[in-house]
Amino acid sequence: MALIDAIHAREILDSRGNPTVEVEVLLSDGQIGRAAVPSGASTGEHEAVELRDGDKGRYLGKGVQKAVDAVIDQIAPALTGFDATDQRSIDQAMLDLDGTPNKGKLGANAILGVSLAVANAAAASADLPLYKYLGGPNAHVLPVPLMNILNGGSHADSDVDIQEFMIAPIGAETFSEGLRWGVEVYHNLKSVLKEQGLSTGLGDEGGFAPNLPSNRAALDLIQEAIKNAGYTPGKDIALALDVASSEFFKDGAYQFEGKALSASEMSAYYAELVADYPLVSIEDPLDENDWEGWKTLTDAIGDKVQLVGDDLFVTNPAILQRGIDTRTANSLLVKVNQIGSLTETLDAVSLAQRAGYTTITSHRSGETEDTTIADISVATNAGQIKTGAPARSERVAKYNQLLRIEEELDDAARYAGRSAFPRFKG
């Protein structure tokens, strides 16, 4: 039995140049686990609290020294001596120590950093890769990458309302092949943008961020890039969206493409998109508090396309249960820092899968070189992963880890492919 011997935390930088928390856990057998915590740009109002210092004279108020201190001064003494493999008890001890419903005392960034570092240390102690330690012998499904190759919304400085335009290589036989297809489309998209005199500057997640006249124009450009790369839209590579509609929901209406639209008008717009394009997934199509609109949309097109709750569910099992009970949405986006502990994350995934909801393991726009989510994706057989464009090392690190996992699994590896999107009839 390996016990927790020491826990240390430090302030490091994420991919946006903002501070974040990194934690190291030392076990009694000498093994060390490390984890770094991501941070989002478009955040749901029901997410667990990310503790920031608020000192404008240091990192413009975005320092995380309070969270670091919480790890060192409060969490570390409380967890010393715990069996590192008892993840649920460790996470519960931190929740009890925090004592708030949203982790507002210690900070979700402090709790999550420790939670993930413990898992990494325990896996090392067991001499197992993290995906196998968490998922056991049945962890073998490699996810379809939802690759964010064109950015709008709060991830880019442009007139495009939708935050992420993604490609999904559903026709590939293996993860490595799917990744290659995505990379080829990404580079072809750059060529298309250059030919049209459009910007090839990058957004937060590595996707291009040109100033386009409409959201449909973005989809058309991507389809052109898919064809130029030698692939067939809908057969080889499908499209997916993250609308992040809470970002443009103001005064009871959706401020979209220069108009103030109702939920029913937005739903009609999405129905047209699903009819006109090979769309397999739409994330956060409506505001996180517009449950009535979400239900109507699910009833209307939920049998044709994956409707993903990100801000709607914030990886929270209690909120997800409401969605399941009311048959609202049909997919869960899984972000470890939304809920703030590994145990709660795995509980949410398990609940979703039992209810027939698809699951997508996801990064945040502020990322680090930490690859834990790649292992979580395989551990849970999630079937899909969002971790940005095939550019910028903090994104590519996750793809490279999945390549390693696929190689290690060898003949046991199965690529989710088209089966990850059971509602898509394209």
UniProtKB/Swiss-Prot annotation:
GO terms for cellular component: cell surface; extracellular region; phosphopyruvate hydratase complex. Keywords: Cytoplasm, Glycolysis, Lyase, Magnesium, Metal-binding, Secreted. It is an enzyme of class 4 (lyase). Pathway: Carbohydrate degradation; glycolysis; pyruvate from D-glyceraldehyde 3-phosphate: step 4/5. Mg(2+) binds at residues 242, 283, 310. It comes from Pseudarthrobacter chlorophenolicus (strain ATCC 700700 / DSM 12829 / CIP 107037 / JCM 12360 / KCTC 9906 / NCIMB 13794 / A6). The gene is eno. It is found in: Cytoplasm; Secreted; Cell surface. Catalyzes the reversible conversion of 2-phosphoglycerate (2-PG) into phosphoenolpyruvate (PEP). It is essential for the degradation of carbohydrates via glycolysis. PROSITE patterns: ENOLASE. SUPFAM superfamilies: Enolase C-terminal domain-like (SSF51604), Enolase N-terminal domain-like (SSF54826). It catalyses: (2R)-2-phosphoglycerate = phosphoenolpyruvate + H2O. Its cofactor is Mg(2+). This is Enolase. The active site is at 205 (proton donor), 335 (proton acceptor). CDD domains: enolase. InterPro entries: Enolase, Enolase-like_C_sf, Enolase-like_N, Enolase_C, Enolase_CS, Enolase_N. NCBIfam families: eno (TIGR01060). Binds a second Mg(2+) ion via substrate during catalysis.
